[in-house]
Regions:
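Active-site-proximal substrate-binding groove within the catalytic cores of carbohydrate-active enzymes
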Residues: 26, 476-668, 675-690
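Hydrophobic faces of well-ordered beta-strands that scaffold small-molecule active sites
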Residues: 302-306, 337, 379-383, 446-448, ...
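Polysaccharide-binding surfaces and accessory modules of carbohydrate-active proteins
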Residues: 1-233, 657-667
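Catalytic domains of carbohydrate-active enzymes, especially glycoside hydrolases
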Residues: 319-341
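Active-site-adjacent "subsite" loops/lids of carbohydrate-active enzymes
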Residues: 299-301, 310-314, 358, 385-436, ...
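Short Pro-Gly-centered flexible turn/kink motifs
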Residues: 79, 254-273, 683-692
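Active-site and adjacent substrate-binding regions of carbohydrate-active enzymes
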Residues: 118-120, 339, 343, 357, ...
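Acidic/aromatic-lined carbohydrate-recognition and catalytic surfaces
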Residues: 107, 130, 236, 343-394, ...
Length: 693
């Protein structure tokens, strides 16, 4: 028996006399449950399915009971320490096929998370084909605590869609269609993404909470393409399987010739005593540890972008100059010209050259960029470098090798072709565009958008469509890495029609992430408040776009949406009434006094995770003795709301309404209960409180 205790995580791994390797336990407390010997064979360290191999038992559409997964035997393990923390590697081998697998568990100092992945090697004499390989597998996720799993287990997911990102919901297993009626079944709870938008319908993460044991297991899949996880049951236990793309679910299939290797998509898996809040805290710390070191996530400069509820992708010199003046006046530090700068009129299906339009900028775009610099701001431009419009003049310089291909045809989506970043000519094209913007135009900020989903993949130089997509995904990440090496101070925002690619393959590289294209500031409140559960608050870019026809409370609500995160200012600032523009400036001035806390703070939710149908929403950030609490009144007749802050129970903290200073709001602190009661004016209103204990 191998017992591992590290950073508050407890792992128990058994190697039997027959050299079968079983992960009996992974949790935030030691293994105390007695697992019956007859059930232990279901506690696989990994699952691996090769083409032509059998499947065992009743398995339905699940990936459990795989072969040669069930045949893999222990071939050794190592336990070392590197700069990140402790590292476990378990080697397994199949004596029949010759396939070898190395299961990696990388711990990170001081955080209750491991990064887990599997490396396959064909050490046999014949080619093999892989249909499924787990990145992490764990059986018995429900074994702790008394009671029936139908009642004690909850799963929290973030549903996603264009303008409706980060819709957090918590379910009992029966609410997702899984009932505990037998000791094993064919049913699974499956979450999957297929395509180049990694968060198109679900974020690649989840939290499983055991109400009886008071512990939670959580995971995030760190990949910018197709991925899969599932919960299934076997040996009267729940099994979690986490992976990248699969043949069954994502059109991925891979041949391995003798001597060839394949590395699975990595996943971060952790466990805590407590619920979602504890998981979010651990993930926040971990996400900061794996992120590319960069000054942007420390400085948190304020961005103005001219798109949302403003120029809507139709910039000109005439329209931009007054906006630049107004943005500088309120304190913005970047000014990003969004879509449309490269073409007159309608431009959607013609993109690809990324040359400025002389009709939009008669004096040249450098005139406008220099004007931005003269106002003390860093200029930025919008790009969409992974696509080329079907009517782009640039197409004359290309051939089919530049693009995703399926069934001999170029893949089209929304009148664009998907570029294939495995092609050196595509890399040269992308490098040339970046070099021109940075070195010739002096751009310091790029909003990198991506408005198509390329689907299941490409057949070019690939064993399957999904194999082609995975290769491209990894090639794009390698290209990003090269750009950040070349231009370490360049800020590149990750945007995919808002938050359609919100994953930590991308966010371990990008310092900032667009959270949504949501155009309604009231609807945005729940998206903003839920975002720090999916990414660090300093990476979470939230639009604030005061409306020309709004009132003071509309401006305040807009600003509160962004003040605990990363401010993406927009709106027709030059046309706002002076006192309403002064509310924008007041908010940004205040933001500059607190932003040094944001990269070191952890999020909390006094009312629980936000509900887009809820009447009140609240988000807090905590750093040491300081807490910042945003509260939004969305709907309903209740004039006040109670915000529990349990760790302050029995204390008498200093509390102030930090923003706005001159508008009505009342509050009361119940010291014995640890509850802040806030009353806000009727309608759609919001306030930001500062609490010092």
């Amino acid at each position: 028996m191998i017992e591992i205790i590290e950073n508050g995580l407890y792992l128990t791994i058994e190697v039997t006399e027959d050299q079968d390797v079983r992960l009996l336990h992974f949790g935030a407390a030691p293994l105390e449950v007695v697992i019956a010997d007859k059930n232990k064979q279901g506690f696989r360290l990994l699952e691996l399915q090769l083409s032509g191999e059998d499947r065992a038992e009743y398995h339905g559409r699940t990936h459990r009971a795989s072969y040669p997964g069930l045949r893999m035997v222990y071939a050794g393990h190592s336990d070392t320490v590197n700069v990140l923390g402790r590292k476990l590697e378990f080697s397994l081998a199949d004596p029949i096929s010759g396939i070898q697998a190395m299961q990696h568990f990388q711990f990170y100092k001081g955080v209750q998370i491991v990064r887990s992945w599997t490396v396959l090697k064909n050490a046999g004499e014949a080619e093999v084909a892989v249909e499924y390989i787990s990145s992490f597998a764990l059986t018995g996720v429900d074994k702790e605590g008394g009671g029936e799993r139908n009642d004690k287990i909850e799963v929290t997911l973030a549903h996603s869609g264009w303008q409706s990102e980060l819709q957090w919901r918590t379910y009992r297993l029966p609410e997702l269609g899984m009932y505990h009626l037998a000791d094993r079944g064919s049913k699974r709870i499956a979450a999957s993404n297929t395509g180049s938008w990694s968060a198109a319908e679900l974020l690649p993460m989840a939290v499983l909470h055991n109400k009886e044991s008071g512990t939670s297991l959580f995971w995030q899949i760190e990949h910018n393409g197709s991925w899969h996880w599932e919960l299934t049951d076997q040996y009267d236990q729940l099994t979690l399987l986490v992976s990248g793309p699969t043949e069954h679910d994502n059109h991925w299939w891979l041949k391995l010739a003798p001597g060839e290797e394949f590395t699975s998509v990595p996943a971060a898996v952790g466990a805590v005593r407590g619920g979602f809040q504890g998981a979010a805290e651990q993930l926040t710390v971990y996400r900061r540890m794996i992120r590319r070191p960069n000054e942007d996530n420390e400085l948190l400069r304020i961005i103005f972008n001219d798109y949302m509820n403003c120029l809507w992708g139709s910039p000109t010199t005439e329209k931009l100059l007054p906006l630049i003046d107004a943005a500088a006046e309120v304190g913005c530090e970047y000014f990003c010209i969004d879509a449309g700068w490269y073409a007159p009129g309608e431009w959607w299906d013609g993109v690809g050259q990324w040359e400025p339009s002389s009709e939009r900028f008669p004096e040249g775009i450098k005139y406008v960029l220099d004007y931005i610099r003269s106002k003390g701001m860093i200029p930025g431009l919008w790009l969409e470098l992974e696509v080329m419009g079907i009517n782009s003049p640039k197409l004359a310089e290309t051939d089919d090798s530049w693009f995703f291909m399926r069934h001999g045809k170029r893949v089209k989506d929304r009148s664009r072709y998907q570029l294939d970043y495995r092609n050196p000519k595509v890399i040269d094209h992308a490098n040339g565009v970046i070099a021109r913007l940075v070195e010739q135009y002096g751009v310091g900020y790029i909003k990198m958008d991506y408005n198509i989903n390329a689907g299941i993949g490409t057949e070019t130089n690939a064993d399957s469509f999904g194999d082609g997509l995975l290769q491209h995904n990894r090639a794009y990440l390698a290209w990003l890495d090269s750009i950040f090496v070349r231009y370490p101070k360049l800020v590149i925002e990750n945007c995919s029609s808002g938050g359609m690619r919100m994953d930590y393959a991308m966010l371990s590289r990008h310092s900032i992430q667009s959270t949504s294209d949501q155009e309604d500031y009231v609807q945005y409140a729940a998206i903003a408040a839920g975002s720090p559960a999916a990414l660090t608050p300093e990476q979470s870019a939230v639009w604030s776009y005061p409306l020309r026809e709004g009132d003071d409370e509309e401006v305040i609500f807009n600003m509160v949406n962004a003040l605990l995160l990363r401010v993406h200012q927009s709106g027709h600032l030059a046309e706002l009434e002076p006192h309403r523009r002064s509310l924008v400036k007041e908010a940004l001035d205040y933001y500059k006094t607190i932003r040094s806390d944001i990269p070191h703070a952890t999020p909390f939710w006094p009312l629980g995770l936000p509900d887009s149908e809820g009447e009140w929403v609240s988000l807090g950030l905590r750093r040491g003795e300081r807490r910042y609490v945003a509260v939004w009144r969305i709907d309903g007749e209740a004039a006040n709301v109670q915000l529990p802050i349990e760790e302050l129970k029995g204390l008498e903290p200093a509390i102030a309404c930090a923003y706005p200073q001159q508008h009505s709001s009342t509050w009361n602190w119940d010291q014995s209960a640890g509850v802040l009661t806030v009353a806000l004016p009727p309608g759609k209103t919001a306030r930001l409180f500062e609490i010092t204990s």
